[in-house]
């Protein structure tokens, strides 16, 4: 929405919209995400928006079934969440590292919110202290990446109000 309001000559930075497919989502969810990314890309093209969508997946040796069945890892649980890093974080970090190598630096926009959980609020508060500008923090694990969290103070009601008020492209 904000990008649509910019004059076309000011839309000079490519915006990469990423989704990480763990390859263990239900077929209904996977299909919906695929259609959403395709529709988002189609709308971006029609409206001349500098948006490129990406569906990221883990490397074969990091997939759920290779690790669970092939390597004998225990089923993930709260205290042993081996899958989060391999299925979600690593594909995203690899993508980001490639973009940093290409452009020198990036800004990652995340929809994380303090209201998601008590642990999320604690983690976000920790990074708040290191901010370089309002809602903009350095990533502690990747150099040359800033993290922008515009929704950090949104409540669950704020999210639902927004989703009901604005049509998804």
Where are these regions (language model features)?
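Nucleotide-activated chemistry modules centered on ATP-dependent adenylation/adenylyltransferase
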Residues: 1-169
């Amino acid at each position: 929405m904000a990008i649509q309001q910019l004059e076309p000559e000011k839309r000079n930075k490519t915006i990469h919209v990423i989704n990480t497919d763990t390859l263990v989502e239900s077929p209904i969810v996977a299909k919906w995400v695929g259609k959403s990314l395709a529709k988002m890309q189609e709308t971006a093209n029609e409206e001349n928006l500098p948006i490129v969508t990406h569906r990221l997946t883990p490397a074969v040796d990091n997939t759920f079934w290779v690790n669970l069945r092939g390597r004998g890892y225990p089923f993930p649980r709260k205290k042993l969440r081996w899958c989060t890093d391999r299925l979600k974080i690593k594909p995203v970090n690899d993508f980001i590292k490639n973009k940093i190598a290409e452009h020198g630096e990036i800004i990652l926009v995340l929809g994380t919110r303090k209201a998601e959980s008590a642990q999320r609020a604690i983690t976000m508060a920790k990074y708040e202290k290191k901010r370089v500008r309002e809602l903009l923090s350095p990533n502690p694990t990747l150099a040359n990446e800033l993290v922008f969290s515009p929704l950090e103070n949104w409540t669950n009601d704020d999210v639902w109000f927004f989703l009901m008020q604005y049509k998804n492209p």
